[in-house]
């Protein structure tokens, strides 16, 4: 039997769990009530296509109304769509029910500010504290909030996107994979408005097939033959990966390089680009050779977004395809990113394969080392033995490579990532350091 009051903790992308087991409707109600107490006003609520989405978004809306705020249900809509409409409608916050690229039994709840941006961690901690209060004072009579639906939310979001970015690409042959997720509600109509020759797959959501053998996590399954470009979204459409006309993957690193170079050439670069420590070394080298300032952050779209605001960067993101194009979006938006790429193709007359040549991808080896010693991954990574092994590796790799050691924040794992021009050197160094980490972590 479930305990009456469970601890709700925000991770890197909201509160997550298996729906109806690790994440209950009661949890959603408590989070909605906490949001009403923290933000007031109107909280817009969007969701992806998971079977549990209606259940959890209804409970979230009930919590918001119980706290005296107005809940505006956007229905199935990409996360960046909820962000954009929160800002456009003057909402105090946006709530999104989604587990992104995870399988359908999982779900999650995250919040964005009224400006459509990631919440600071201190605000999430405040929501956690408010959600722990089992019996807050609640309004009655006329103080109870309303739950309303915005039926034309997809049309409003599509209009906002096309009003900001409308590449001239009539006749271009485009393949879209909507991951049987939130992109289905809006991406096809946006691309058809552009007059492209459109093929759409992953556009038959049934509540259980989101991300199943489709979308950005399975982009290698797409058959791009007969198309000029393909785009694959994740479940809530805040990321996108591309395939060029030859069927080669254009990941987030290459997309950032393409967009950053174009922005620089047009004098719209601002404070440069923001990437993470796990971005490919080839991206860092490419940006340096182009004279583009680059800020490197820890992994996580929150860190990227905060750094972009701090330095005034125009583009930033992660290899996974979670990319923020600051001129057109406040958070990662797969559809906006795809349109920005099409815009570069249209203005330059170059194919995506030509544009992707802006950077050379360095061979990369990543090993996840499970640790068993008390103190967890952080203590193992900071041990003198491991630090000496990392320093030895840095000396061997020199200017032609690098090593990144990153303890996981969610599991007892240390990630060892090595990049080098020579793949054999890359593999050898990574395996050696991973062995040291394993022995230090009690793995033998």
Swiss-Prot record:
One of its GO terms (molecular function) is magnesium ion binding. GO terms for biological process: carbohydrate metabolic process; peptidoglycan biosynthetic process; UDP-N-acetylglucosamine biosynthetic process. Binds 1 Mg(2+) ion per subunit. Keywords: Isomerase, Magnesium, Metal-binding, Phosphoprotein. The keyword Metal-binding applies. The active site is at 100 (phosphoserine intermediate). This is Phosphoglucosamine mutase. Mg(2+) binds at residues 100, 234, 236, 238. The keyword rRNA processing does not apply. HAMAP family: GlmM_B (MF_01554_B). It comes from Rubrobacter xylanophilus (strain DSM 9941 / JCM 11954 / NBRC 16129 / PRD-1). Catalyzes the conversion of glucosamine-6-phosphate to glucosamine-1-phosphate. It catalyses: alpha-D-glucosamine 1-phosphate = D-glucosamine 6-phosphate. Signal peptide: none annotated.
